[in-house]
Amino acid sequence: VGLDHDHVWGLLGAIAKEPEAELVAIADPHPELVDKAKQQVPAEVKFYSDYVKMLDEAKPEAVIVTTANNRHLEILRECAKRHIHYSTEKPLASTAADAREMERLANAAHIKLMVNYWNAWAASTHELFHRVYAGELGPVQKIIVQYGHEGPKEIGVSKYFADWLYDPVKNGGGAIVDFGCYGAEWALWLKGRPSSVFAYSLKLKTAQANAVDDDAVILLEYPDATAIIQASWDWPYSKGQVQVFGPKGSLLATGDGVLYRAAKSQADVDHPDGQPVTLGPVPHETSNPIAYFLYCIRNDKPIENPVAASLNVGVVEILDAAKESIRTGRAVKLPAN
């Protein structure tokens, strides 16, 4: 459902490579995007301008949603009525109220609800998570997450994607949502729910006529830890990494690998953040979003973190609290679940 999110083209490629996946229909109202999709999918795939008509006529078992964040609830409501499993690109929704309602509807309809993050399938992500949970660092005391790039327009996103990415209602914000969600995802997964949220944001590209931030910092407070989230559309290059510290050492995960540095170890000139860790193979069912979504549906397995609905309701609650903190200039207490 939707072709106006540029991640859709990678997902169509993943569907084509997945033996268990059959693409039956696509819904999007933009003729230019439909023409592009027709060049990339089998001829028997049906196209609709109205996604509700598609749900009724094509009767899919599951949908992949790739459109504006503020439409996620509306589309899930229609899927829940028809008991159709639902996966969407991050974040789960543009507001916490929408996210909570999506989880409620999915649970009531007994359908799978998944939120796709690209980092969830990386070998470096799996390795860092398992080492942290195995206690290799001791109790997590600090998490530093940095996700960003030069900016949507600067990296050449489509005009259809840009139309809603730069809209504070359709997206829910700017960089604070687009990349801040990764930091909230990591923090909730590795440390749990914070007690308070403080944030500030900037509009560095003042010449661009849009109403969203392009640089943000979010500070999450825990009784025994802090998490610092840096999200930006202003960096000179693309970057996505998380660094975790505990009394026994630190781990740094990038898209390319994991570095480990033990407590009291001497810094290595070639590897100041630690020594490279050998990454094990990722099982096929957790190697990409299509394979995992189908695996959970076919085997009636629950969607697990970090792509599960419950954690991602928390992600959007953190983002809402961050935006409220920016508005008031004060830290926002986050109620316990």
Where are these regions (language model features)?
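N-terminal Rossmann-like dinucleotide-binding module
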Residues: V1-P42
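Active-site loop of classical SDR/Rossmann-like NAD(P)-dependent oxidoreductases
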Residues: D6, E32, T278-A291
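Beta-loop-alpha module in the N-terminal Rossmann-like domain of NAD(P)-dependent dehydrogenases
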Residues: L33, V45-L105
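C-terminal helix-rich "cap/oligomerization" subdomain common to oxidoreductases
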Residues: A62-I64, Y292-N337
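Rossmann-fold dehydrogenase core element
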Residues: E101-N119, P139-Q141
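Predominantly a Rossmann-like dinucleotide-binding segment in NAD(P)-dependent oxidoreductases
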Residues: N119-A209, G329
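Contiguous beta-strand/loop segments that form the cofactor/metal-binding neighborhood of enzyme cores
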Residues: A184-V258, P289-P302, D320-A321
